[in-house]
Amino acid sequence: MMRTHYCGALNRNNIGQDVTLSGWVHRRRDLGGLIFIDMRDRDGIVQVYFDPKYQDALTAAASLRNEFCIQIKGEVIARPENQINKNMATGEVEVLAKELRIYNASDVLPLDFNQNNTEEQRLKYRYLDLRRPEMAQRLKTRAKITSFVRRFMDDNGFLDIETPMLTKATPEGARDYLVPSRVHKGKFYALPQSPQLFKQLLMMSGFDRYYQIVKCFRDEDLRADRQPEFTQIDVETSFLTAPEVREIMERMVHGLWLDTIGVDLGKFPVMTWQEAMCRFGSDKPDLRNPLEMVDVADIVKDVEFKVFNEPANNPNGRVAVIRVPNGAEITRKQIDEYTQFVGIYGAKGLAWAKVNDINVGLEGVQSPIAKFLNEEVWKALAERVNAQTGDILFFGADKWQTTTDAMGALRLKLGRDLGLTRLDEWQPLWVIDFPMFERDEEGNLAAMHHPFTSPKDFSPEQLEADPTSAVANAYDMVINGYEVGGGSVRIFDPKMQQTVFRILGIDEEQQREKFGFLLDALKFGTPPHAGLAFGLDRLTMLLTGTENIRDVIAFPKTTAAACLMTEAPSFANPQALEELAISVVKAE
């Protein structure tokens, strides 16, 4: 037998037992004729010592170095009282080695487990990086999450059904990864960006509660929390309303947090998209941050200051204020840095006002814009934002979207910089009632979620007549500023689906070509259905306390969508390309 126990599982209950351990040398120390090692496996670390009493084992141990793969047979001993290590789960015991077997030696490591290695090093030698206890713990947490999800889904009547990986390219927002067909030359499969249409087809097939933990693929620009291939917890239901779907999914996430880290998330508040954007400048607000945006266009619309009065009198403009309690100590240098920061989001500047004494009106205000205000306007502003002595006010004034984006980003930065964001809290919420459509860069209407989302209380005729007023029957789950899941009630009427396609500029010929199978299926007694998808990688990221999604994926890609370990992507074999009838055009 190669193993009787995991290293990290040993405790006082094992004292006096003979055990067989298999794992790696984590650290080695020589002390006065004895050799000590910390031995590690996926479950943790235990101290092992070699005593002259077992000379063969001690002699063999002299050759041990870090990351040798070994087997130990020995006895679990209680540590002396003064040697108990409270920082180790196994710190009350140690193992007296009676036999040592070296499975494999190790070359000098290209990584140093005791120092910060570059991410490039960690990804190139990922198989070594994953030996680190913190990395092993993250992957164990991920496995625990998926195990919990499967149990919950099974207990709630959901069926785990697989959907195809080789499918048809359909417009879902990002570029597809294409797979050439050898049999059908000149044609391509697409790897799925999500199982969206297949799970809707499963509802039409009568499987009223479906789920799947599934790989998805998107060829898009990457960030710290995105990967070209990622994992979704994908869910779809029939005959349930949006609030009923949210209730089930909230119970799942509530239970997941309790099971994984022992945290009770409480009841999730529900907030409309409009409220989230107006108060927090984001459709995924981080409610740990107490700062809010307050609209003041009605107060400043008549001041003789174009920066304020122009957007204040423009239906598409916005003037908003963030009050920072006790922020008057912020220096001019810091204010200049914040002004530069909002410029990234298109803001032309950042007005500010320090409240040195709230009791003396404008006389107590220090601000380059004070000369444009009068006592009446200042009083109204101070009352609107509840200004107090020692506060600073930051003003954003521009187009609605620019002000909202810039001030929303500033809110987050101020919260971090000034220590206002309560990092030890969990703040979940649902965001609902998104706009059905938004304008793309060319000014055309695009679906804010996807083209299969149902509008709220709109007929096809009403939607076609006034699409920009339509509210989507959609919902996102947000935790601490991260969108962890999103879903919607789906369109189940063929006339409504064709109307949405037309609004998006997809003519009837394109509809038949791209979505003919869906439009046909909608004609045969389609049930009302709704669903949601969670990002498993992002959930794991939150539950393990890391800010980099690559830390919770065993073998992730870089931000350039490359695998440094296997050197993928690579050039294809010319013969394989010939069989696929593909010629490669060299980049200029």
UniProtKB/Swiss-Prot annotation:
Pfam families the record matches: GAD (PF02938), tRNA-synt_2 (PF00152), tRNA_anti-codon (PF01336)
Cellular component, GO annotation: cytoplasm
An annotated GO BP: aspartyl-tRNA aminoacylation
Alphabetic keyword roster: Aminoacyl-tRNA synthetase, ATP-binding, Cytoplasm, Ligase, Nucleotide-binding, Protein biosynthesis
GO terms for MF: aspartate-tRNA ligase activity; ATP binding; nucleic acid binding
Record: residues binding L-aspartate: E172, R218, H449, R490
Family of this protein: Belongs to the class-II aminoacyl-tRNA synthetase family. Type 1 subfamily.
Function comment: Catalyzes the attachment of L-aspartate to tRNA(Asp) in a two-step reaction: L-aspartate is first activated by ATP to form Asp-AMP and then transferred to the acceptor end of tRNA(Asp).
Protein name: Aspartate--tRNA ligase
